[in-house]
A protein has these predicted regions:
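Short amphipathic alpha-helix adjacent to the substrate-entry channel of hydrolases
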Residues: 1-9, 204-208
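Accessory cap/linker subdomain of secreted extracellular hydrolases
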Residues: 3, 31, 49-51, 61, ...
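Short beta-to-alpha linker loops that shape the active-site pocket of alpha/beta-hydrolase fold enzymes
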Residues: 7, 12-16, 98, 222
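Gly/Ser-rich "nucleophile elbow"/oxyanion-hole loop immediately N-terminal to the catalytic nucleophile
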Residues: 24-29, 36-72
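Extracytoplasmic/secreted proteins, especially bacterial periplasmic and envelope-associated proteins
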Residues: 29, 33-36, 68, 76-80, ...
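Alpha/beta-hydrolase-fold serine-hydrolase catalytic core, especially in secreted/extracellular enzymes
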Residues: 87, 208-276
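Short beta-strand/loop motif that positions the catalytic acidic residue
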Residues: 180, 186-188, 192
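Conserved alpha/beta-hydrolase "acid-adjacent" motif
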Residues: 193-199
Length: 276
């Protein structure tokens, strides 16, 4: 992407090593932390080279036109940030991403974790991603507060009943689709039994209902990236998508079929449709 004139920004989330805060899996706090990066890239937020030297760093090189893309949990954060309606976020490309955390962990009031993750729940994923714990000095100063945060998550997620409550509603980004100003290019695997298609399809349908520019590419893979998948033309489509929504290039990508589905019998064939 650099050779095509794009700069790449990598950002650690709340609770990651050398960061601050706690990992709270899909919470409003996590979403707003990533949103702050978009604000910084657009000159609305200050940033510093580190936490002690008070040396400010500006994103003066940025046009203010920003895209977000990632897979799985990080792709989920792309959706979350888009639902804030933050100015400057022109498009997102979430791959194998979650649009509703309740539907990821619960089905009909039952606990239904991803395949291979039996016993998993929201607080366990938060603990798994809490890499601040890998810094002994840092962790020693926060471990009691973090233990309290874990206890609060365990109570709020209400595993015993499986009920949908305010805790889960905060993590249901479908509630805020009408706030999205960015275009959306969804990529998902039909055979993904980690993040299932009950995440991407309701999201795409909600985008259609709101008239938000959207594209969905469903491949036959599992919980994977498909950038180099033979016959998918994924990278070419992504390049043209970004050229249009970040650089304003009139290349017709927005007029092409909105849905592409890889054939299960011939993986060189992609079925196209204007809607799902």
């Amino acid at each position: 992407f650099n050779e095509r004139g794009y700069a790449t920004v990598l950002c650690g989330g709340l609770g990651t090593r050398d960061s601050e805060g706690f990992t709270l899996t899909g919470s409003r706090e996590e979403v707003l932390a990533f949103k702050a990066v978009i604000d910084w890239l657009n000159g609305r937020c200050r940033a510093f080279t580190n936490k002690t030297d008070n040396i400010e760093i500006l994103a003066s090189w940025c046009t203010g036109n920003v895209a977000m893309t990632a897979k799985s949990y990080l792709g989920t954060m792309c959706i979350g940030v888009a639902t804030t309606g933050v100015e400057g976020l022109k498009t997102i490309i979430p791959e194998a991403a979650i649009s509703n955390w309740y539907a990821y962990y619960r089905t009909g009031g039952l606990n239904v974790p991803a395949i291979g993750w039996q016993g998993d729940d929201l607080n366990i994923l938060a603990k798994y991603c809490f890499s601040r714990a890998k810094d002994p000095e840092d962790y020693e100063s926060i471990k009691e507060a973090y233990a309290k945060a874990q206890d609060e998550m365990i109570q709020a997620q209400d595993r015993a009943t499986g009920n949908y409550n305010r805790f889960w509603d905060e993590r249901n980004y479908l509630n805020l689709v009408d706030k999205i100003k960015a275009s959306v290019f969804i990529v998902h695997g039909i055979n993904d039994w980690n993040v299932k298609t009950n995440q991407c399809i309701p999201f795409f349908e909600a985008l259609e209902k709101q008239g938000i520019p959207a594209k969905m590419m469903l491949h036959q893979g599992e919980h994977v990236y498909i950038h180099t998948l033979k016959d998918s033309n994924m990278l070419d489509i992504m390049y043209r998508w970004l050229e249009h929504y970040l650089k304003g290039v009139d290349n017709g990508i927005e007029k092409e079929p909105a849905v592409l589905v890889e054939s299960g019998s011939d993986q060189s064939v992609w079925m196209a449709s204007d809607t799902w």
